[in-house]
Amino acid sequence: MYIEVTGYGPALVLIHGWAMHSGVFAPLVEQLRPHHTLYLVDLPGHGYNHTTPTPLALPQVVHAIAAATPPAVWLGWSLGGLFALHAAATLPQVRGLIMLAATPCFVRREDWPHAVEVSIFTQFAQDLKQNYTETINRFLALDTLGSTHAQSELRQLRKILNARHTPNTATLQAGLELLAHTDLRRAVIDLTPPSLWIAGQRDRLVPAASIQAATALAPSGQTELLTITGGGHAPFLSHANQMTAALQHFIATLP
């Protein structure tokens, strides 16, 4: 599996969200690469890995990334957070975990009220079969909904998406299945490496309350929470400076 490597310094793995590719992290990459060696992952079926045979499944993807990277901090945005969290729960080489607009359980359950209804993802899966482009555009709009810079972020996401190979319907449906049915709350409770959880105050897809609930599950004393005021689901597009400062501070405190 191809992983782009850039920069110098302590290793940081970055994993993107649904339908996107690692190019979405450009605002962070620009500021982080003078200080960190960045491992920019395109998930299977996405971007430069659009033809990789690796299935879009947590164990297989995490194993493939781990085989190609040194001990590192792992950052996952949205869907990417599930892969980063699974890695942190299963691999000793994960020095720290950064969950960016990500949660161990993306859908509402009886004992997990601060999340979206599963119908959000099942409806997107159905709509993909009818109109691929319109469905992708609606999801990107949901990514930016609520942000104080929504229109600018939406234009950025559309431009970034089309800069590399776009995933096919089967790949996107596999990602939606992960979002709809994965529950890694037990992994958070048993988490060993320190973790930083970043929420967008105005995120409509992963409400800040769900990330706050996740941090309450994590071991005390090694868990940090940052809420980006005015941020939506992609706060690194609108608040890159604040994000970069938070990431560097967290990584600098790791043993």
From Swiss-Prot:
GO terms for cellular component: cytoplasm; membrane. PANTHER family: AB HYDROLASE SUPERFAMILY PROTEIN YCLE, MONOACYLGLYCEROL LIPASE. This is Pimeloyl-[acyl-carrier protein] methyl ester esterase. The keyword Glycosyltransferase does not apply. Its EC number is 3.1.1.85. Belongs to the AB hydrolase superfamily. Carboxylesterase BioH family. It catalyses: 6-carboxyhexanoyl-[ACP] methyl ester + H2O = 6-carboxyhexanoyl-[ACP] + methanol + H(+). Pfam families: Abhydrolase_1. The physiological role of BioH is to remove the methyl group introduced by BioC when the pimeloyl moiety is complete. It allows to synthesize pimeloyl-ACP via the fatty acid synthetic pathway through the hydrolysis of the ester bonds of pimeloyl-ACP esters. The gene is bioH. It is found in: Cytoplasm. One of its GO terms (molecular function) is pimelyl-[acyl-carrier protein] methyl ester esterase activity. The active site is at 78 (nucleophile), 203, 233. Its main location: cytoplasm. Gene3D superfamilies: alpha/beta hydrolase. InterPro entries: AB_hydrolase_1, AB_hydrolase_fold, AB_hydrolase_sf, BioH. Monomer. Pathway: Cofactor biosynthesis; biotin biosynthesis. One of its GO terms (biological process) is biotin biosynthetic process. Keywords: Biotin biosynthesis, Cytoplasm, Hydrolase, Serine esterase. Substrate binds at residues 18, 78-79, 139-143, 233.
